Each structure stands twice: as C-alpha cells, then as structure tokens.
Amino acid sequence: VTRVKDYAFGQVTTEAIRASKNDAGSLVDGLKEEVDGAIYTCMRSLAIAMFKNSGGARGQISAGSNVGTPTITLANVSDIVNFEVGMILNVSATDGTSGAKRAGTVTITALDRDAGTLTASGNWTAGIAAAAAGDFIFQNGDFEATKSMISGLGAWIPTTAPTGGDSFFGLDRSSDTTRLAGVRYSAGSGGPIEEILIDTAARLVREGSKPSHAFLNPLDYANFVKALGSKVIYDRASPVDEPSIGFEAVKLMGP
C-alpha cells in the first residue's frame, strides 16, 4: 500500500502580525484560528475520500449543463456537500483514476445546496476552455501526476468487479474478485431497505465474512429509521414527560 499526502493551507497576513505587535495573545488567537481551519479542511477532505476510489473527483457536471455560462448543475445533487465558496476547481473527462485534468481552473463564487448548482466567477469555458458537460470536478491539486488522495472504499471494494489486468497496489484482483475486491450485491428491483440490508448480510456471511457495521448516508438512514418506526409498538402504559421518536442506533440481526 502506497502512502499519499493531502494538504491544507492556512495563512496569517503581515498586517495581522504587525497589528498584534503589542498584543501577543491576539496573534496566538489568529494562528489558532488558521490552524484549526486547516485541520478541519483536512478532516473534510479525508471524510470525502474515505468513500471514493482515489481519483479525487468531488462531483460531475450534469449532461444538461451549459458550461458556456457561470452556473452548472451537478449530476448528483447530493455531491454539493463536497464544495465550498472560494474553492478552486479543475475538471477532467475521467474520474481521476486515469487520464489527465483539463488546462485551467474556475473559482466558486456561489452555490445552491438545494438545487445542486455551482456558480463560478465567470463562464466555465472562460476558465477551462475544454470544459464539457459530463466532466468530473476536482478541487485544484487533487488530480495530479503524484496521487494525493487515499484509496477509499470505492477503490478497495469497487462497484464493478475487477477484470484481467487489474493492478491494485500491484495486485491483479481478477483471479478471485470476491476474496480480493469484496462483495457486490445487487438488490435487483429494489425493496425495503431493511430487507436489502439483511440480504446483503446473508451474502456476506455466505462468503465467510463477519459484517459488523453498515454505513448509510443521512437520507438513506432517515428512510431506514422511518421504515422501522412504522413497525414499532410504543408502550404507553407509563406517562413520559419527553417522548422519544426514532432510534439512537439500529442493530441489524443478520444470519
């Protein structure tokens, strides 16, 4: 496994340093704020990368977006949580696991977290001439010749089973995709989320696994809790001053 390095920057202006000449405490406060901000930025970057494939893409421009304007819409609206105002972006036709980024950058000046739109300081094609609908979006510096993003769950357990010629840290996992690249379970036509989780657990146990945790995004977890809530009978024999709704945690009893 190859280690990678991800960075965040903090800065204190010369003006701030000079202004605190007679008050060392104020300089310390300024430094602490910058360092805390950089640490938080690193934590956010790591949290995003933990579930990604090491390519570094934070989202994708929707097929219907017009890159000749300042505003584009994300293909997955929920990816809006990966962006912030002031962030400098690159784009590429690939997801970062291959290929190269397009020349140029754009800077986010506004975003709509409900509509899933990113607005740049100018037309996207003004900052990145070759930008196109369907391109993947990266924070500037995340898609370089030297990798800076960790290999998250999307890399260790890829959505598509590895095929011949695969090289994951030098290992061709196509010889036994389940043992070397995890289990991919398709729910087919769908169904209640609790049933899908139980079926997934059954498949994992069949392969000799001992699953201990299931990770859901907030929206899926909310739907899961609501589905379970409709099947719970609340004992009203004793009055409760502060009734509780929902669950602090959900323990799934699999095979």
Name what the model sees in each region:
Residues V1-P255:
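Core alpha/beta structural scaffold of self-assembling particle/tube/pore-forming proteins
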